[in-house]
Amino acid sequence: MLTRRITLGISRNLSRGALINARFASSQSYLDSVANLKKDLKKAMIAKDDLRKTTIRGLLSGIKNKEIDAQGKDLDEFALHDLYSKLITQRKDSIEEFLKNNRSDLVEREESEIEIIKNYLGQLPVASEAEIDAKVSNLLTELKQSNPSLQLKDAFKKVDWKAAPSDWRASASMIKASIVRQFKTKS
């Protein structure tokens, strides 16, 4: 029994150390965004703004879960962008359900939370969906001029995926989704 407790204690300490290292390997804008959230949480607590406080706590909880899931991988502003976008989508789905059930009080709360999350989403140094779509559209136009029978897989091969985050200011998943969307509309 004693060895079991010791083993559990050691493994618990090791996992905490891994989380600390993961946070230090993250990008500076990621760290700044998390620090900004914590600062805003403190302000919301002092101002007794329950809606903002609850929303920011939800964001920090989602970030913490993302860090745990990453297990030592670098996290950056694109991971935050994906998380915030996912949370906005969840709230939009909730609004639809609340409207079906005539819960206007909950609809207003969800809409307010969406505005708060969009505020933090706008602070991230990430290209907007419209900017990404414009770059992808230009890329596909150039590729189709040189090769009229362009396939989707060929378009994916032409993107420098290692340089894409810095050049495009977008994550690979955002660029891939835009390529698929644009390719379907141009075909």
Curated annotation (Swiss-Prot):
It comes from the Eukaryota. It is found in: Mitochondrion. One of its GO terms (cellular component) is mitochondrion. GO terms for molecular function: carbon-nitrogen ligase activity, with glutamine as amido-N-donor. It holds the Pfam family YqeY. Keywords: Mitochondrion, Transit peptide. Residues 1-24 form a transit peptide. InterPro entries: Asn/Gln_tRNA_amidoTrase-B-like, YqeY/Aim41, YqeY/Aim41_N. The keyword Cytoplasm does not apply. Gene3D superfamilies: Uncharacterised protein YqeY/AIM41 PF09424, N-terminal domain. Belongs to the AIM41 family. This is Altered inheritance of mitochondria protein 41, mitochondrial. The gene is AIM41.
